[in-house]
Amino acid sequence: MKIVYSGRFTELLEETPLSVQKAFYKQLRFLAGDIRYPSLHAKKYDESGNLWQARVTKDWRFYFTVEGDEYRLHDIKRHPK
């Protein structure tokens, strides 16, 4: 699968702490290999928009859609508790 970053996602990622960025890139490698990789905890977030959520860390999540052979990254933010 190919990874596509939205412009907004790139900006949001740059604003996250460096430790979160490092964890994100590690998780992204897992996503590229297998969406069911255990540490991702990937799940459908919104059925109507085909939006998925995956774990970066305990406190951070990223959001993406699956379009053909692409994962399109849309958002990264703190996980609400």
Language model segments and positions:
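N-terminal first-folded block
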Residues: 6-38
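A short, surface-exposed loop/turn module that caps and links secondary-structure elements
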Residues: 29-54
